[in-house]
């Protein structure tokens, strides 16, 4: 029998269907073959029994050389995405090269080739790190493969779809084959809460959720926190920030806020009637401590960089509201990164006009961790995203609330 | 001085064959925090700080750091031909599998005996991932 023969040859336990074997034998081209080879290796690492279908994927494309290699391996091998597969931001190449002359040529070439590779693969060219809001939205219970720090926990916890903590390449491979190995968070038992997090801190805005995510991720590291005590329902942006930060300061692929998030309505259900491994509490003091850790300095700034993760329409409205009737100080460069879809609406609603009128820029398709910011290499800036500061593409990036960032941009310095 | 071979079964994750001097790390490794041109570990306070992972059979508990930097880190080492020859790990997760896959370095785990007890830094090790076998050449006085 072909199946058992193949299993024997590979010396492994994972069951593969006839179609999967034909893909591995190269019958559908080298690109798809390589994609499945990677998925099988991952499945073997986790003792997955078999592959399961995914209905969509998000590849955290990055414009780095390792990323480029894999994208071209698949694209040159004739692969096409089998299910909707969205892409992360790289950078808006024509736009930035018009503004900055000094972006290194080789880096620009890598970015160009990465973007072209995804185009050839037939991916959704979203170039957005929050695709789950507009371009590629999973439903409750859907099986997907979403990489990207805010996307993985958001999709698992807020939407209640199922994804593992994917790398860009494993998510792309899943999008190309339309499958992923059955392991990890695709299995209900593995979606059990691990840590009880008792929150009594006041959470008044999006930045407080950034701090909460930072603190929880750092304390727990790897695990599935179950947060209690949050009385007011968090909004989309607050949840995005919590996801992004907890999955950067730690490795949080999923969390529960029983009663607020969809998968478990009670604490007991979130822990699947088991006991928590550990318990932590978050009071105002812990949030302040997190803030103090992130505070880097005050003084003169050269730039403000917002939109990590990409700002939503609501956040663009907030920026416009804060900048209305004001001017950004000469010498300060003010940037907001967002998705192409959010920008279209922000333009229509007049927010882009206000931000640009004040001297700022609203840029699409772009991540703050890209070579396009080369001009700020030796500059000091300010951001509302600790994730942005962590990338270290700048001499220094102070972290503060959006209001403080706008204030610093207008005054030319952080008080 | 005589030599003795210890042959252990292992679990293949990424196939292939690699041999070289063993380098044992009890701490997780971030490939991004090595010098891409020499393979020397640059991470301060790491037990391998200042040592090169180039051409070694690396024995380590797991990878660490974000997927983007980890994968790109190993990729850059391979471009400069200073990547390890084989990887023997304890806790293998998705990012480590992807990293080894794109640079085509054999990756194995689950040796039939604890790798950290059997393998010493400096011993010559052959990793035949295809056959699922790790061979350690023990030097004995």
Residue ranges of model-derived segments:
Chain A
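Intrinsic disorder/low-complexity segments
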Residues: 1-10
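Non-transmembrane, aqueous-exposed alpha-helical and coiled segments at domain scale
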Residues: 9-415
């Amino acid at each position: 029998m072909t199946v058992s023969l193949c299993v024997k040859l590979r010396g492994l336990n994972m069951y593969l269907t006839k179609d999967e074997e034909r893909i591995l034998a190269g019958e559908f081209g080298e690109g798809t073959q390589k994609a499945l080879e990677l998925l099988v290796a991952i499945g073997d690492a986790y003792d997955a029994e078999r592959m399961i279908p995914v209905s969509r994927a998000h590849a955290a494309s990055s414009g780095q050389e390792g990323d480029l290699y894999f994208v071209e391996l698949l694209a040159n091998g004739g692969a096409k995405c089998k299910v909707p597969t969205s892409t992360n931001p790289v950078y808006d190449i024509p736009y930035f090269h018009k503004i900055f002359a000094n972006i290194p040529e080789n880096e620009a070439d890598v970015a160009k080739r990465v973007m072209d590779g995804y185009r050839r693969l037939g991916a959704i060219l979203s170039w957005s790190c929050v695709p789950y809001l507009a371009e590629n939205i999973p439903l409750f219970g859907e099986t997907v493969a979403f990489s990207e720090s805010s996307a993985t926990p958001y999709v698992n916890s807020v939407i209640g779809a199922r994804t593992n903590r994917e790398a860009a390449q494993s998510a792309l491979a899943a999008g190309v084959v339309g499958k992923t190995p059955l392991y990890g968070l695709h299995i209900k038992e593995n979606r059990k809460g691990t840590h009880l997090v008792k929150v009594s801190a006041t959470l008044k805005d999006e930045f407080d959720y950034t701090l909460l995510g930072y603190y929880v991720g750092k304390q727990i590291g790897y695990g599935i926190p179950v947060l209690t005590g949050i009385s007011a329902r968090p909004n989309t942006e607050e949840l995005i920030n919590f996801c992004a930060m907890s999955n950067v300061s730690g490795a949080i692929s999923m969390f529960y806020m029983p009663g607020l998030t969809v998968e478990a309505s009670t604490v007991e259900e979130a822990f699947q009637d088991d006991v928590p491994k550990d318990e932590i509490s978050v009071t105002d003091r812990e949030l302040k401590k997190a803030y103090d850790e992130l505070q880097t300095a005050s003084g003169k700034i050269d730039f403000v960089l917002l939109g990590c993760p990409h700002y939503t329409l609501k956040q663009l409205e907030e920026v416009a509201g804060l900048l209305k009737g004001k001017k950004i100080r000469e010498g300060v460069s003010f940037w907001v990164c967002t998705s192409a879809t959010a920008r279209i609406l922000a333009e229509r609603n007049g927010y882009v006009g206000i931000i640009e009128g004040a001297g700022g820029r609203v840029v699409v398709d772009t991540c703050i961790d890209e070579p396009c910011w080369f001009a700020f290499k030796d500059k000091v800036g300010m951001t509302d995203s600790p994730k942005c500061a962590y990338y270290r593409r700048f001499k220094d990036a102070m972290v503060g609330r959006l209001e403080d960032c706008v204030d610093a941009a207008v005054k030319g310095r952080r008080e | 001085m005589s030599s003795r071979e210890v042959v252990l079964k292992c679990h293949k994750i990424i196939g292939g064959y690699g041999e070289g001097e063993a380098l044992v790390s009890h701490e997780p490794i971030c490939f991004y925090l090595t010098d891409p041109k020499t393979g020397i570990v640059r991470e301060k306070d790491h037990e391998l700080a200042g040592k090169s992972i180039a051409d070694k059979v690396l024995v380590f508990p797991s990878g660490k750091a974000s997927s983007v930097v980890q994968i790109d880190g190993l990729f850059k080492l391979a471009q400069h031909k200073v990547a390890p020859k084989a990887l023997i790990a304890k806790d293998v997760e998705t990012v480590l599998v992807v990293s080894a896959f794109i640079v085509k370095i054999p990756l194995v785990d689950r040796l039939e005996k604890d790798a950290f007890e059997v393998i010493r830094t400096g011993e010559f090790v052959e990793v035949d991932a295809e056959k699922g076998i790790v061979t350690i050449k023990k030097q004995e006085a």
